[in-house]
From Swiss-Prot:
One Pfam family matching this protein: NANM
Protein family (similarity comment): Belongs to the NanM family.
InterPro entries documented for this protein: Kelch-typ_b-propeller, Kelch_1, NANM, NanM_proteobact
Matches recorded under HAMAP family: NanM
Keywords: Carbohydrate metabolism, Isomerase, Kelch repeat, Periplasm, Repeat, Signal
NCBIfam families associated with the record: muta_rot_YjhT, PRK14131.1
Active-site residues annotated for this sequence: 247 (proton acceptor)
Superkingdom in the source lineage: Bacteria
EC number: 5.1.3.24
Species the sequence originates in: Yersinia enterocolitica serotype O:8 / biotype 1B (strain NCTC 13174 / 8081)
Main location: periplasm
Protein name: N-acetylneuraminate epimerase
Catalytic activity as recorded in UniProt: N-acetyl-alpha-neuraminate = N-acetyl-beta-neuraminate
Region forming the signal peptide: 1-35
Amino acid sequence: MTQIYHQYKKKLSTKVILLSALTLCITFSLPYANAERYPDVPVAFKYGTGARVDNHLYVGLGSAGQSWYRLDTDKASSGWQKIADFPGQPREQAVTVALSGKLYVFGGVGKNSASDTQVRALDDVYQYDPQTNQWQRLATRAPRGLVGTAATTLNGTQALLLGGVNKAIFDGYFTDLAAAGGNETQKNAVVNAYFDQAPADYFYNRDVLMYDPAKNQWKSGGQVPFLGTAGSAITAKKGDLILINGEIKPGLRTAAVWQGKTQGTELKWQQRPDLIGAEKGAVQEGLAGAFAGVSHDVVLVGGGANFPGSWQQFNAGQLYAHQGLKKQWQQPIYALVDNQWQVAGKLPQPLAYGVSIQDKDKVILLGGETSDGVATSAVTQLSWQGGKLHLE
């Protein structure tokens, strides 16, 4: 039986390694070498998705509806171009992986049809061919509903999908809310019953899902040895997968970081250092909806959102851990250097739930939402050079 690591308890003090104020000043004043600033996306969007194929960046969905846009990074001054609209229903939190020169869009949260009255966890898959500018829905369904799922590829030919909510529980919550109608007492009962549960009782997905587009088949990549998460950041480093934070139940995030290495047909997992707090002695509440990537072998993580105080309430025995707390969008950027996290700098503004795209040794951050959920069209480039973080 696989041992599951239950990281419930959090220490209320965390060692933090801070760069000097002078270093931070230098970091923000110098763009990295040979950088060309990428233009903002034509529309502000959040909860969208995207990927890179060759020298083109693609983003769409979320609050952008069915729209998708493409940027040729070799001709960035020409700006973003609109491509064919997504043929499926509008959705948020879909994930996209570029495989063999095509985009594959998985799941999300939305309606099954235009006439549907309820959002639900979706399991459909769409393919986009840049050569023909055409979309098609594939004759397959993911083995799980894909909301809050993290996705990447380690070989460019197969997609790896991890985490995400339990479809039955997630869909059931919205069904029960709809059934309550205008009865506030009944609605409150539904909300309290949903949030007042232990992390394991949400049955977040622990299966590693592998999709092979050549065969249009799903396979098992084993199970993770820790609680399933939703909204984790994900990136790849030297052929290994890095899974960063995410929520272990609604409103409660984990600071854990895991590394997955391919071993046969499955992934072998090793825990990396937990993400540190943004200030000396501060608790790291964990992040959901953060941005992540790798630059010159340094893992970079920035932004995200959480509920400060949620771990304190949870450790005091309150399962509804974020009750009465205010959601906070985060600004710090962290770097994993020599297997140790440090606070490397800050984003231009608090930001979460956008798109991270790896572009060689740059990490491109596109869109997302700022404080109080306001969508942005901003594009920011991160890189690590000379022991410093650079933003453009």
